[in-house]
Amino acid sequence: MAKTDFLTADMTRRQFMKISGKSLAGLTLSASMLSLFGCSQKQVDSGAVATWALPQGLLVVNADLCTGCQRCEINCTLTNDGVCSSYISRVKIQRCLNLDGAGNGLLSGNDNCFVYFPDTCRQCEDPACGNACPQKAITTNEQGIRVVDTDKCIGCGACHEACPWHMPTVNPETGKSSKCIACGACVAGCPSGALSIVDWDAVTSAAQAAYMDL
């Protein structure tokens, strides 16, 4: 795939939303944006770097820095559920372990080695999870985040099945579905820097710096 000149001119939040949850492979980032994301162009080219558009900024994932320690999952569930549980975590690492050799649906592995890639909700503009919910329990809050109304949720799992990435997860203890609410707990729990959130002002400044350097 031919590279696209990326972030060397105006880059809007809407444009980032179009590539939210996708690898940046095939895109050429400016030096200022590479510095902001804490990655190299080589890592971008390899598909190791992806971004998620959140209300507070960009969630940047660098798979090359992920050790698979699962602390992001632990911090997520401790913060939101008061328990340690990879299964109900809103950020997914445990399913990337490739224990059965089946892959994770995102990356096929490298020389039969494990490939760790933190994955989470894309906050889709037209969410399949919400559309599939028979109780209309998944709505959009004032920040633009898709949230589950646990009073309406019946734990049927329709949201999980409808999501192309199977992100919503029904808690077997509560019988309620949960999904990412962009709280940032996963980032706070990451010891390796594989997860980071870059605020929108910094993204805008880096894009403007790239434009000025042309």
Locate each region found by the language model:
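N-terminal secretory signal peptides
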Residues: 1-15
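Mid-chain, structured segments of secreted extracytoplasmic proteins
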Residues: 91-127
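Short, intrinsically disordered, charge-biased short linear motifs at domain edges
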Residues: 51-64, 106-111, 117-122, 165-171
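Primarily the internal scaffold of c-type cytochrome electron-transfer domains
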Residues: 198-214
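C-terminal segment of N-terminal export signals and the immediately downstream linker at the start
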Residues: 31-75, 209, 213-214
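Iron-sulfur cluster-binding cysteine motifs and their immediate structural context
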Residues: 42-44, 71-93, 126-154, 158-178, ...
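N-terminal export leaders
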Residues: 11-37
